[in-house]
Structures are given as C-alpha cells and as structure tokens.
Amino acid sequence: MAEDDVRDGETWHQFGFPDPERKEYLALQAERPTEVGPADRRMLLEGFDFLALVSHSCFRIGERPVVVIWRRNGVVDVIVRSADCTVDQRRTLKGAAAEKLLSAVLATHADAWTEPFEPKEPVLDGYSWDMTVYAGSRYFECCGDNAAPREVAELLRAVADAGLPLAWDGEEIAFACANEEGDHE
C-alpha cells in the first residue's frame, strides 16, 4: 500500500479508498502511514483509533459497502455506507454502547489474520473484503475472498446492534462456519 501513498501539502492520502473518513483520518497524521509486522498487530488492535471494513465485488466496480469505526475524543463514531450509497448513516456511541462495539472489534482477533482468509472450498464469485486497522500513522490490513470469518459477521452484527443498518452485500454476510464448509447468514 505504501507505494500508493502521496503527500499533498500537509495531508497523506492513500488512493483507492471509497471512504472520505479515511482521507480525513490520514490528514490528521504527521507521518507517512507505516504497516506494522505480526509482532505489533495485537498492541495496535487494542489501541486502534480507526478501522475501515470494505467489501468488494468485481460486478459492482466503484460501489463498495463501507463500515468505519473511529475512536476519538472519548467517543466512537460509526459510519455505515451501502454499496449504492442509498444508506449513509453515522452514529456517535458513548459509554456502555461504545464499549460493547469496541469489545466486538477486539473479539475479531484481527491481529492474528496474517494471511488472506479463504474458505476451504472457494467459489469464484468476485467477492472480497478488506479491513484496515490504524493507530496513529501505523496500520495493518486483513483481507479475504468469497467469505469473511465469523468474527467479521459478529462485528457487523454489533454495528447493527448499535442502531445502524446492516448495509453489507444486500444485507447478506458470507462467512465460514465452524465446519469450514461456508454458509450465508
């Protein structure tokens, strides 16, 4: 990703992202975004400031559902944008509601996802996803094809429980079951 970074005046931009919130977040950083190695991922996840979860489909180029979780100033902003932008909602969470969502982020154990997630029997459906977790100018990425881990589905449910719509792939989440055969929910 670093080769796509540019400095425009005093702002870092990473090209190719559909979420203006990421551009705003990166504009606040004084340093060039730096990807961390596996040893630093857990600490970064526990102290994250910004998380962007994006779904991709080769059949819907340029239309990507986005979930952004931004922790700042003692509150958590959650933004949900559907692929076609018919849903574009933001909610600010405080107290117990914010802690519940932050617990769901930590429960993903995304720090351990160092390889692309692929179900045992993949289907060439053109679907993929990625999640980028930032703490300051440091970040790590997770990604997968066809399906997402059950923990991503649980994170999306936590976003829905916070009162935001589940605007993700037409309200369908593809994820791998415990038996690794794959399923939809």
What are these regions (language model features)?
Residues 73-83:
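N-terminal glycine/threonine-rich, aromatic-flanked beta-hairpin/loop signature
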Residues 67-71:
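Conserved beta-hairpin
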Residues 3-61, 66, 83-185:
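Short, well-ordered, aromatic-rich surface patches in folded extracellular/luminal domains
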